[in-house]
């Protein structure tokens, strides 16, 4: 796996990111994301994702919560109603996997 950079995200009152996946044009090689919650002193702004049965999952807002997820999973950030939401997101792209064998 290859780490391809970190992004610092700030969402302020009124901001949101509608339901989407991270496989948009230009990001086809992205396989996973790692998100880390940096603060919890805001309202709204739930990080929501959906499982294969379309069940909604709301991720904890606790500071330090880390979520690793497949880039194909639909997710969103709901509207911020008070304060600012800060997080770091690290996309991870795949490299060609090379089979190795241990020689004894």
Residue spans of the language-model regions?
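Catalytic core of non-heme Fe(II) oxygenases with the double-stranded beta-helix
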Residues: 1-104
């Amino acid at each position: 796996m290859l780490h391809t950079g970190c992004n610092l995200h700030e969402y302020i009152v009124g901001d949101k990111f509608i339901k989407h996946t991270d496989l948009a044009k230009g990001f086809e090689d992205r396989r996973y994301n790692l998100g880390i919650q940096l603060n919890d002193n805001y309202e709204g702004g739930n990080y929501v994702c959906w499982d294969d049965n379309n069940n909604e999952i709301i991720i904890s807002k606790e500071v330090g919560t880390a979520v690793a997820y497949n880039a194909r999973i639909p997710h969103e950030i709901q509207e911020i109603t008070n304060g600012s939401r800060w997080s770091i997101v690290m996309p991870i792209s795949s490299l060609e996997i090379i089979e190795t064998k241990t020689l004894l």
